[in-house]
Amino acid sequence: MKKQILQLNLEQTSSAAAEDTNLDCSLAGYDYVLPPERIAQNPAVPRDSSRLLVVNSQTTGKETPPLHQIFRDLPDILRPGDLLIMNNTKVIPARLYGRKSSGAEVEILLLEERKFNCWLALVKPGKRFKKGTQIIFEGLGIRNLGIKNSPHYPLSPEGFPPSPVPNPHQLTATVLETDKATGGRLLQFDLPEGESLVQLLDKFGEIPLPPYITASQAADEQYQTVYAEQPGAIAAPTAGLHFTPELLEKLRDRNINQAFITLHVGVGTFRPVEVEDVATHQMHEEWIEIPAATVAQIKATKAAGGRIIAVGTTVVRALEGAAASGDLQEFCGKTNLFIYPGYKWQVVEGLITNFHLPRSSLLMLVSALIGRERLLNIYQEAIASQYRFYSFGDAMLILPEARGVNSH
């Protein structure tokens, strides 16, 4: 009788494990219900007053309950010798409003610069934007976001000094073609030789907020990290929004240092996964740069026994994408790496991240770190504990021990 019971229990355990594995690859396995009032419409003030849910050790097979702390407690949670990797991308004023020659109103969202002053953009309404259509944009008034020159979006092509725009209150663009992959349009902006659109976005564009933020009173600078330097993103790396200059200084004082990568966050970050078998999902491309100095810091930290803590899923994609060959190297280019349960980690050991949308590639990435079922249980606890979700929401810290990682 005992043998029969034991056999039955083994069969049930095997069946449950198989079902859980199947859900790891099923879109339905990443669904959860979020009350609308839990979607943060405004950021915490000050930044580091946001809440921090700490997922700690799970090395004995028994889950330790998460700890509920405040983000400014981070220096007391991390260890001296740990290294935080941060994304220094800067959100550009990529949303522009204009009109066609017929007077019809137009909204566009810049996605990426394909060549100098020639941009791929989403257009709304988009059905009637045929080749040759001209769009006229009116100035919104100069802003002080401090767009700087960067290798990815140079302010002027080599050999051409910037020249003044003839009409400083108006900007025009012409539709060159439709992009089949995105449904967007390739727009050629009509500017004097040597003049860059990036220089003019402060005047003609707006910072685009995510579609789920509908009633925000946030200033533009609140949707930038305090260490943002390289313009090119159309969405903020939101895990970094919680840091203040004072907190960064306190971390350095504790010998918890920081290194930087650049990943220009694209519109794909908001798009849900739509295929039922998540393994067949085609990830969007994003531009990344991993400097040699950051690679050296990471290798030195690991050699000294420190832990590599990624600040945000963008950093995870950048580091793991650059280490796809098995060894992290200096890198500049695009990645379409899709991380989901079963992924074999190369660089990242811990993660600071916000709470993500159901059925999103970001939720799958975090699931690859600590397990899908465990993550969804943590999300339910966060909802019950009144945490704020998504871009302006609270954060969670996944320590390496939570994954069973033996850090050196």
From Swiss-Prot:
- Keywords of the record: Cytoplasm, Queuosine biosynthesis, S-adenosyl-L-methionine, Transferase
Uppermost EC category: transferase
Its UniProt entry gives the catalysed reaction(s) as: 7-aminomethyl-7-carbaguanosine(34) in tRNA + S-adenosyl-L-methionine = epoxyqueuosine(34) in tRNA + adenine + L-methionine + 2 H(+)
Q: Where in the cell is it found?
A: Cytoplasm
Q: Which GO terms describe its biological process?
A: queuosine biosynthetic process; tRNA wobble guanine modification
Asked if the Swiss-Prot or TrEMBL record annotates the protein with the keyword Cytoplasm, the reply is yes
What SUPFAM superfamilies has UniProt attached to this entry? QueA-like
Identify the EC number(s).
Answer: 2.4.99.17
Q: Which InterPro entries match?
A: QueA, QueA_dom1, QueA_dom2, QueA_sf
Keyword S-adenosyl-L-methionine applies:
yes
Give the pathway annotation.
Answer: tRNA modification; tRNA-queuosine biosynthesis
Q: Which GO terms describe its cellular component?
A: cytoplasm
Identify a single GO molecular function assigned to this protein: S-adenosylmethionine:tRNA ribosyltransferase-isomerase activity
Q: What does this protein do?
A: Transfers and isomerizes the ribose moiety from AdoMet to the 7-aminomethyl group of 7-deazaguanine (preQ1-tRNA) to give epoxyqueuosine (oQ-tRNA).
Q: How does it assemble?
A: Monomer.
Q: Which family does it belong to?
A: Belongs to the QueA family.
The protein here is known as S-adenosylmethionine:tRNA ribosyltransferase-isomerase
The gene from which this protein is expressed is queA
